[in-house]
Amino acid sequence: MIRNTTKNITVITNMNRILMEFDYSPNIEVISVGGTFNKRLGGTVGAYTVEQIKHFNIDKAFVGAGGVNIEENFLSNFNFDESIVKKEILKNSKKNYIVMDDEKFYKDGAHKFGTLEDVDYIITDKAPDDTVKVELDKYDVKVIY
């Protein structure tokens, strides 16, 4: 688990739950990105959050998705303010990991925040079906399950 790493790493997050996850990890520096706190999401969102993210050089980003439309090639979410934050994170990261349940390959949120070209890996709970694998291969997206 990353929490017990001996490497020195920096975690940048807008989510309170993630902040608390690394509370007692001596080798992990945690940076909290400010903004408008959304109680339902448990994190900060909006224009101020996006502006702060622009100033970071991110090696690896781990971003949740409400849906991945493999036929029309887009990542989506259900909250606009959260989506603009995710879009900026993907733009400023060298490697992008989308974290989601397998069932979200067949769901669409109202707000698009990226495409499969923006994604390097998808981390999911089980192997996707063959139709999904074929589409992901077109964009060189690797799946971890």
Predicted segment positions?
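Charged helix-capping and loop-helix junction motifs
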Residues: 45-49, 76-85
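C-terminal functional extensions of proteins
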Residues: 109-145
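Short internal beta-strands
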Residues: 10-16, 97-100, 120-126
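N-terminal active-site beta-alpha-beta segment that forms phosphate/nucleotide-binding
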Residues: 1-56
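Short secondary-structure boundary segments
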Residues: 34, 64-66, 100-103, 125-126
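Short, conserved loop/helix-junction motifs that constitute active-site signature segments
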Residues: 2-6, 89-94, 113-118, 136
